[in-house]
Swiss-Prot record:
<dbReference type="Pfam" id="PF16159">
    <property type="entry name" value="FOXP-CC"/>
</dbReference>
<comment type="subunit">
    <text>Forms homodimers and heterodimers with FOXP1 and FOXP4. Dimerization is required for DNA-binding. Interacts with CTBP1. Interacts with FOXP1. Interacts with TBR1. Interacts with ZMYM2.</text>
</comment>
<feature type="region of interest" description="Disordered">
    <location>
        <begin position="1"/>
        <end position="45"/>
    </location>
</feature>
<feature type="compositionally biased region" description="Polar residues">
    <location>
        <begin position="1"/>
        <end position="28"/>
    </location>
</feature>
<keyword id="KW-0238">DNA-binding</keyword>
<dbReference type="InterPro" id="IPR001766">
    <property type="entry name" value="Fork_head_dom"/>
</dbReference>
<dbReference type="GO" id="GO:0001227">
    <property type="term" value="F:DNA-binding transcription repressor activity, RNA polymerase II-specific"/>
</dbReference>
<keyword id="KW-0479">Metal-binding</keyword>
<dbReference type="InterPro" id="IPR050998">
    <property type="entry name" value="FOXP"/>
</dbReference>
<dbReference type="InterPro" id="IPR047412">
    <property type="entry name" value="FH_FOXP1_P2"/>
</dbReference>
<protein>
    <recommendedName>
        <fullName>Forkhead box protein P2</fullName>
    </recommendedName>
</protein>
<feature type="compositionally biased region" description="Low complexity">
    <location>
        <begin position="290"/>
        <end position="303"/>
    </location>
</feature>
<feature type="region of interest" description="Disordered">
    <location>
        <begin position="647"/>
        <end position="666"/>
    </location>
</feature>
<feature type="compositionally biased region" description="Acidic residues">
    <location>
        <begin position="697"/>
        <end position="713"/>
    </location>
</feature>
<feature type="zinc finger region" description="C2H2-type">
    <location>
        <begin position="344"/>
        <end position="369"/>
    </location>
</feature>
<feature type="region of interest" description="Leucine-zipper">
    <location>
        <begin position="386"/>
        <end position="407"/>
    </location>
</feature>
<dbReference type="InterPro" id="IPR030456">
    <property type="entry name" value="TF_fork_head_CS_2"/>
</dbReference>
Amino acid sequence: MMQESATETISNSSMNQNGMSTLSSQLDAGSRDGRSSGDTSSEVSTVELLHLQQQQALQAARQLLLQQQTSGLKSPKSSDKQRPLQVPVSVAMMTPQVITPQQMQQILQQQVLSPQQLQALLQQQQAVMLQQQQLQEFYKKQQEQLHLQLLQQQQQQQQQQQQQQQQQQQQQQQQQQQQQQQQQQQQQQQHPGKQAKEQQQQQQQQQLAAQQLVFQQQLLQMQQLQQQQHLLSLQRQGLISIPPGQAALPVQSLPQAGLSPAEIQQLWKEVTGVHSMEDNGIKHGGLDLTTNNSSSTTSSTTSKASPPITHHSIVNGQSSVLNARRDSSSHEETGASHTLYGHGVCKWPGCESICEDFGQFLKHLNNEHALDDRSTAQCRVQMQVVQQLEIQLSKERERLQAMMTHLHMRPSEPKPSPKPLNLVSSVTMSKNMLETSPQSLPQTPTTPTAPVTPITQGPSVITPASVPNVGAIRRRHSDKYNIPMSSEIAPNYEFYKNADVRPPFTYATLIRQAIMESSDRQLTLNEIYSWFTRTFAYFRRNAATWKNAVRHNLSLHKCFVRVENVKGAVWTVDEVEYQKRRSQKITGSPTLVKNIPTSLGYGAALNASLQAALAESSLPLLSNPGLINNASSGLLQAVHEDLNGSLDHIDSNGNSSPGCSPQPHIHSIHVKEEPVIAEDEDCPMSLVTTANHSPELEDDREIEEEPLSEDLE
């Protein structure tokens, strides 16, 4: 029965478990050896021993399976990872099962195995245990080696990555270094050029600094010369009286060296500002001498004063005005004013920047107009302009002085005049005389030297003592036509071409000059127009006005002949007719001027035509009898006799009184007889200022310039 049960258990165990055949075969082999070795062994003991061993192996296998299942449920990931390293089931089933003492006693009591068999079994179990331990150690070593290999591979990969990164960084650094080297090479290649440029710039700056120093010295020298010339000119004209020792004081006060560029510019601007103020004072005061000192001139006429005394009194009065203006200008200069700053605008040439206040202007001046190449060039241009204007001014001053000296000489050959003068002709001649001197001068407000304004050396108020001078002016003005116009224009050609100044010639004279300058002595109307605009800057504006006047003069005067030729209609000059009409005497017009006796009602006695002419000539004084008093009756009588041409010579002492008048002398005055045209809107300054005792007439001291006359005279 026991054998059958053992066989059944073995068969069941073989059917239920895999891999037990090897174990059973080993046990069978061991049992065979035991049977062969032991004589007392039996079949029942061997079978029981096998049964026990199989049970132990099954239990051990079950325990291992349970442990694997529990460990798989707890950590399936770790089990999956460690599957290739797990011990096979066959080996796990061979795990030794320790035989308890009770089991040993049962085996001994039942006498299943002999002691020798038990020893052999125990030895086998120990051997199996050793094998299992060796296997476990082997598998552990393999696992450790695998772990180490994995770690080494990971480390190698990391090292490779790091090496790659380092290589990339090294490559980038090498590229950057190469780029830097290339840039340095390029810079080194360009560096010699830069050094040369820097050296050139330094040399240029040094040259500019030297030029600026020379230029500053030239400016100081020019300023000194200009001040000396200005003082000398004023001293010559009698405007100021300076002792010889004091003439050099302003020049000596100028510093010679140690000035900064800003101080030199400030000095230049201050001096030019003072000169411009003085120039304006002389310009505005030159023609207003009689109005500023009307009381002194009136008293001089009643007290039988001579013209030179009156002249000196006027000049002395004017010098006081100039001194006052000079003092006021110096106060303005010290009061934070500036020549280059006015009305919130910078007056530097070509700048015109808007500055809100004086501080902003100073910042603008120091920043934009510092001592550099551009400012130096602009200053040089201004110096050239000033030099040209000074040359022109000196020429004009000499010419004016000669004219004044010449015109105020006493007449030597009085000529009789059978008929009274034409009033319009005398007024025209006086006006033309005044136009030839002051209005032909260039107006140069920017020049540091003051232009000399013409100052009449005789009294402006017409007195019996001044009537011979007026006669001389009339005669000299009529003789002027014997002088060729080319000699008048040639020296001032550039001035008239560039300056907007009216030429002191009639349209007929200008037309004749244009025709005479042409190659074939004939011009078309358009060619005459082009000559006017080309020669005079004054005719480049108001074309409609003066072109009408040119056409009117061409058709009016017989000396201009219209000829038809291939070009069309051209104009020529008949010189015989031109000279004949100039030398022709005026016959007079009795209806225009009547012989009116001297009385207090002189203004009321003027006829309608005379009053109309005076009204057109802006002379309300003579047409208003209320302004005439007893003190000026002799003066008005002299004016009346001069306008009628009955006076050309009076006693050299100038004896005159309100009660008596000198004997009229008959003279022959060469004046062109022409119809009255709208030329007489201007009038001589001497007539404007007659009997000027009222301040209401001070606004009429400067009369606006009108277009040129449309007649010959």
